[in-house]
Amino acid sequence: MNAPIPHAVCHLNDMPLANSFASLPPAHYTALMPTPLPAPYLVCASASAAALIGLDFSDIDSAAFIETFTGNRIPDGSRPLSAVYSGHQFGVWAGQLGDGRAILLGDVPAPTMIPSGRLELQLKGAGLTPYSRMGDGRAVLRSSIREFLCSEAMAALGIPTTRALCVTGSDQIVLREQRETAAVATRMAQSFVRFGSFEHWFYNEKHDELKTLADYVIAQFYPQFKTAENPYKALLTEVTLRTAQMIAHWQAVGFMHGVMNTDNMSILGLTLDYGPFGFMEAFNATHICNHTDQQGRYSYARQPQIGEWNCYALGQTLLPLIGDVDETQNALRIYKPAYAEKFAELMRAKLGLQTQQPDDGKLFDALFAVLQGSHADFTLFFRRLGELRIGQAASREALRDLFLDRAAFDDWALQYELRLQLENSDDDARKLAMHAVNPKYVLRNYLAQIAIEKAQNKDFSEVAKLLQVLEKPFDEQPENEKYAALPPDWANDLEVSCSS
């Protein structure tokens, strides 16, 4: 992906901070101060994220930086607040939720962010808010590192996502399933407004506030719709399109979110709230990455369907503004074709296909059946597929090693080679194109776990190293080959949940 366009570098103390979300009526948020953490220290930081806001990266070791992004120091211009929202969790209406441990510091200039030209800075784990419910308002080091690494890894993969500026830690004890230490992750996005933000006002029958929120979102992030015949239908159509395309990207790279509740769905079509996520390893379409998801609602195979369900939930809330059921349904009908078109486009690229053929869908389906039958490693398969040479059986061997049922793979490979013969590209050109879209490196859970365990002993070097590797997922990086390896046996026992 393209590097961010640089703009004037500024020091933290000179950063012009505002808060456009605070322009909404007070019912939409609660103004409050973060709860300080004792003796904070820097765990990790992203230079590429800092570049988006023109922040001088040499500031990261300063006391002011660490204190600011722990919530112990409030910069000039900040109007800290936590937003209210509601949502459906695992398909069930959960009522009011809100930022239970996230506090928005404000927004800063970010010229590459179209159309707002700004990024919000949000501290996750900054203390109790009125929306904390039974929680303590804190995040733990483990989950904060996971969110930081995955945010930056997804950005490097070219997938729409919130960004992570840094993680700070403290020795303060936090009780979860076991004793852990507290941390704060600083997240960045043009907006953290969610589907659940709209659900909150719809289900509380406060349509004036619903309209106020919709008008704010359109003015700030979709200004092209202000003059549309029906701005709210245009908004729903665009959000539905972005959501479908985002999830197509997830499926193509084997990413599983784990908690696709409506309160975790971004109104900008960004991957939001990294919790019990995972990247597909041994392929299993029904894989559940969140061990608390007993029914498999958010399994890999169901993500496209759930994305559509969530868009319909959003459509329900916008119906009073759109004013017509048929118009609302017309906006939502874009989901299925938009998803199918984007997924097919991504799959053709992954297979090195430059043209569209009528039977491509059958080729894709046959491939996933073969991957399922042998539980072949998702990332390794697509990366190695670029090495295949038409008519050279020996070039298949590294691929065949990934399959238990090699005969089934051979049958598919024959279909694939016949399909490649319809293309006007040679083996070397195809390999280059495929390696540019099929990552060699993804954030496997075991890699994150190794980095986390070292960080829990105050060794943050592996977090920094893993970030360095994941920022260039398509490069060969021969010196980092071990980060592309199959997971060790002990990784089979790793479980991730909503606990964070």
Curated annotation (Swiss-Prot):
EC number of the protein: 2.7.7.-, 2.7.7.108
Gene: ydiU
Top-rank EC class of the record's enzyme: transferase
Family stated for the protein in its record: Belongs to the SELO family.
Disulfide bridge partners, by residue number: none
Cofactors: Mg(2+); Mn(2+)
Gene Ontology MF terms in the entry: AMPylase activity; ATP binding; magnesium ion binding
Described purpose of this protein according to its UniProt entry: Nucleotidyltransferase involved in the post-translational modification of proteins. It can catalyze the addition of adenosine monophosphate (AMP) or uridine monophosphate (UMP) to a protein, resulting in modifications known as AMPylation and UMPylation.
InterPro entries the record matches: SelO
Official protein name in the record: Protein nucleotidyltransferase YdiU
Coiled-coil residue windows: none
